[in-house]
């Protein structure tokens, strides 16, 4: 084991996780091929850079302090084959549409993080499954094995392919944004794709009209040349599940501090360990044991990180977890991604909020709602789906509970696609079980389609818009008195 440590994580090294118990760890049969693949990853350049990671840390600090809102979304399990122009653009446009709605409703900057350019690994409850009467290894994501039953052998070469597809995806994201895809002067050019619902289209049009009216006014007074109106930042994320992949992409790099002139040769540059595979990584619900490998790995990286918490999370685990992952209590360093289920959130979330917000970690975490994972169910034929009414209900309850607890729900974490899939039941289109087979294309969990995702964005926007009106009315009332 290497001996290098970071100032904020005593006794830590990129490989110190290997001394800890680990869950969801694949056993590669070909150790030589694994070593060859990881050695190649060590020589490849970073996919993301420290200055980008630091910018996200700053944005998430604002979210933790109630000054911004975090929108995170993308595929459940990203496939290598999703590295195509149309597929990437459809997800970018959907995140832009949702963030426009949130910007209008919450009246706060929106931080956008895609579940893309690296979301290739998935935890599984069983290492094997039965297909056509034959037992085969479970599909664990393209970074490990293939979906076709004949491709279920763990293949270390997929680690390098994952790097290549992540790099290509992010390269196109950067190019598309640099070419003006996110220009606020033309939000109708983003299109509503597959949305046909007149009421939803009208509501979106109203939002666009308000934004364009504001831009016309800014143009009149000569204040519309700010580059923030023509571009956005879109950060990448994935579950940091496969540590054999994350370790070789963890690099000791200079902190991008402000440079002085003339250069100060007396003070060596500050260095930190960055995971350069993505801007943001999270620990899943199945791997967040405090004394296990994933928490050990995550405690040493400078990236902002997330932790999934749900019904199986004891309240007593929260503060030890935060003290391990964020000993300096940096606001925005840790995002707590809550995923209880619509029938459990009311009984579990309040205690979790009170535990954190009554401690030394008050106003330091980002509270983010994942209304997807606690609401998965199987219907006839074993098809996995989610009811939009359950997803909507959990998000709605979470907003209400945070308001009652005087805490701030700073984000939502969604599995979604810009395609017209039929994977989640209900929503404005009223999808039922018979509709699931129309366009069910997910290789893992069911995703929201464009229409359903926009409905959730309007739910959050309307909540914060109403809250803003209430505060304004209260302010006026007090000023009169």
UniProtKB/Swiss-Prot annotation:
Keyword Flavoprotein found: no
EC category: transferase
Pathway of action: Metabolic intermediate biosynthesis; chorismate biosynthesis; chorismate from D-erythrose 4-phosphate and phosphoenolpyruvate: step 1/7
GO MF, one example: 3-deoxy-7-phosphoheptulonate synthase activity
Claim: Amino-acid biosynthesis is one of the keywords in the record: yes
Pfam families: DAHP_synth_2
EC number: 2.5.1.54
GO BP annotations listed: amino acid biosynthetic process; aromatic amino acid family biosynthetic process; chorismate biosynthetic process
Keyword annotations of the record: Amino-acid biosynthesis, Aromatic amino acid biosynthesis, Transferase
Region of interest called Disordered, as start-end residue ranges on this chain: 1-22
InterPro entries for this protein: Aldolase_TIM, DAHP_synth_2
Catalysis performed (reactions): D-erythrose 4-phosphate + phosphoenolpyruvate + H2O = 7-phospho-2-dehydro-3-deoxy-D-arabino-heptonate + phosphate
Family stated for the protein in its record: Belongs to the class-II DAHP synthase family.
SUBUNIT field: Homodimer.
Name the record gives this protein: Phospho-2-dehydro-3-deoxyheptonate aldolase
């Amino acid at each position: 084991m290497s001996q290098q440590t970071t100032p904020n994580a005593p006794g830590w090294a990129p490989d110190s996780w290997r001394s800890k118990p680990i869950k969801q760890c694949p056993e590669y049969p070909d150790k030589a091929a694994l070593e060859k693949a990881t050695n190649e990853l060590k020589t490849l350049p970073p996919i993301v850079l420290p200055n980008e990671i630091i910018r996200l840390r700053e944005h998430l600090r604002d979210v933790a302090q109630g000054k911004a809102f975090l929108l995170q979304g993308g595929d459940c399990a990203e496939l290598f084959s999703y590295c195509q122009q149309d597929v990437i653009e459809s997800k970018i446009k959907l995140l832009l549409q949702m963030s426009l709605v949130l910007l209008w409703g919450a009246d706060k900057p929106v931080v956008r993080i895609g579940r893309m350019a690296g979301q290739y690994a998935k935890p599984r409850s069983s290492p094997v499954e039965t297909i056509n009467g034959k037992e085969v290894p479970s599909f664990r994501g393209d970074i490990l094995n293939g979906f076709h039953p004949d491709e279920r052998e763990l293949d270390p070469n997929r680690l390098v392919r994952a790097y290549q597809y992540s790099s290509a995806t992010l390269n196109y994201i950067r190019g598309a944004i640099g070419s003006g895809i996110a220009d606020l002067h033309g939000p109708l050019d983003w299109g509503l794709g597959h949305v046909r619902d007149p009421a939803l289209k009208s509501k979106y049009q109203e939002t666009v009209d308000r934004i364009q009216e504001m831009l016309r006014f800014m143009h009149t007074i000569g204040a519309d040349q700010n580059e923030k109106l023509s571009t956005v930042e879109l950060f990448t994320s994935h579950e940091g599940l496969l540590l054999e992949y994350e370790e070789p992409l963890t690099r000791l790099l200079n902190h991008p501090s402000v440079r002085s002139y003339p250069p100060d040769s007396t003070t060596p540059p500050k260095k930190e360990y960055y995971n350069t595979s993505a801007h943001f990584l999270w620990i899943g619900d199945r791997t967040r044991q405090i004394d296990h490998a994933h928490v050990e790995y995550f405690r040493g990286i400078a990236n902002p990180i997330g932790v999934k918490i749900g019904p199986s999370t004891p309240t007593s685990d929260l503060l030890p977890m935060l003290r391990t992952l964020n000993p300096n209590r940096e606001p925005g360093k840790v995002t707590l991604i809550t995923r209880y289920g619509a029938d459990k959130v009311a009984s579990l979330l309040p205690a979790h909020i009170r535990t954190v917000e009554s401690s030394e970690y008050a106003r330091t975490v980002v509270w983010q709602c994942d209304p997807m994972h606690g609401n998965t169910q199987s219907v006839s034929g074993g098809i996995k789906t989610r009811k939009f009414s359950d997803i909507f209900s959990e998000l709605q309850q979470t907003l209400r509970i945070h308001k009652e607890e005087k805490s701030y729900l700073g984000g939502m974490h969604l599995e979604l696609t810009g395609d017209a899939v039929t994977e989640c039941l209900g929503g404005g289109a009223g999808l039922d079980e018979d509709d699931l087979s129309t366009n069910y294309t997910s290789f893992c969990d069911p995703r929201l389609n464009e229409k359903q995702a926009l409905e959730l964005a309007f739910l959050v926007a309307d909540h914060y818009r109403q809250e803003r009106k209430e505060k304004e009315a209260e302010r006026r009332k007090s000023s009169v008195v």
